């Protein structure tokens, strides 16, 4: 490793003095002006990770649902999953190192991880459509090449497409072809095979309106739609030709504001969905005959998918370990419906998609979605092989169910949550079951809920357990929350510290909106009093 050359090149990507950023679930994210040095250094780190794992590593330049002026970067591990936690720490150390310490930090990573520097390295790079992304991805390439790594620049991709490419490259082609065409063809063939089962006798062609958040999703959906256009018409809105990325549109806006995005015309009963800026999240919604807006979030998406998978498994007659993974933010009604009606086991993990993904890997079939619409389904290799064998061997109704399940398996992007893949899965299931969007929404009724934030002097005062549903410290807080919850019907509440700033997040749900609002307010007052609240005391919102 020519550290002299690295240091010389690093000086051309100088770090702003005193800037400290932490590698989190979403990698690094901040204003694009501050990211040049981080991009270069993540190129360096990707080479070391590639040498250590003897695999292709991915680097994605994106800031997902953040505003257009921001950008970010995250590394993708060999199976398309997020970077290993120990390497997240290396990323933080390397990004935060002052210029004179870069050499030392790199040497320490090499020693600690026993990196064989003679090993070849291969890195694949992609970016979203932000104005800053092309220049920043060149800084990544600069870091890769100065350490002698080889690379392939995919140019513009959605984040889940890059995860898919990494997985394909490291599976020796078993998972699919590591090209955009390979991705489009695999998903489209599975979708067309599924929708061909649906009788079209006089039916109007199915269509869905898609808000693409003025991001990369529009570009990639347009590239792909001709592959499956016979089965589904997609009408694109916020396609990047006019508005700003994520501005008053996109999945995050729709979920947080509980209203439709700008730039989309909604008629009663029409299915609409929104992607986020890098197309790894999706939420659905519609307006009823009275003009009321209805959101269908990740909880209801997981319920639709897992219920359908359970039905297919029952038809095939296979006993398979199927589980759904949620976070504490999942609506209580969804958990009750899955456990009590569908008899599907539900597991709760800490917030953060990497926790859900890892838990889902423990099942034969693991379905996970965060309420924000980020999720997918994972199938063990043994289950995939078995289902595809049954699909070929069986002729009767069992064979048809096995073939349907085999196509569903191919339609999922198992490397990461993928808005395009998830949309096609949802559209296929709705078509096969003959469900309208209103009927899907009516599977269960969400419990009213409220989320609040409380400013505190130090968020570390609060620690949690039981997948963030119980507060351990400060003493007395959890007991006081329990006493408040007992006053309301079908109620629960929890508090958790933010991962990035000194605030505590409060969640409450109950059988009425007024009760949920009151409970959230009372819990936020407790946090303010017992956990060192600062600034203005929480005020009632009801």
Swiss-Prot record:
Upper taxonomic lineage: Eukaryota, Metazoa, Chordata, Craniata, Vertebrata
CDD domains: PGM3
Catalytic reaction list: N-acetyl-alpha-D-glucosamine 1-phosphate = N-acetyl-D-glucosamine 6-phosphate
Documented EC number(s): 5.4.2.3
Name of the protein in its database record: Phosphoacetylglucosamine mutase
The gene coding this protein: Pgm3
Sequence positions bearing N-acetylmethionine: 1
Known cofactor(s): Mg(2+)
Pathway connected to this protein: Nucleotide-sugar biosynthesis; UDP-N-acetyl-alpha-D-glucosamine biosynthesis; N-acetyl-alpha-D-glucosamine 1-phosphate from alpha-D-glucosamine 6-phosphate (route I): step 2/2
InterPro entries: A-D-PHexomutase_a/b/a-I, A-D-PHexomutase_a/b/a-I/II/III, A-D-PHexomutase_C, A-D-PHexomutase_C_sf, A-D-PHexomutase_CS, AMG1_II, AMG1_III, PAGM
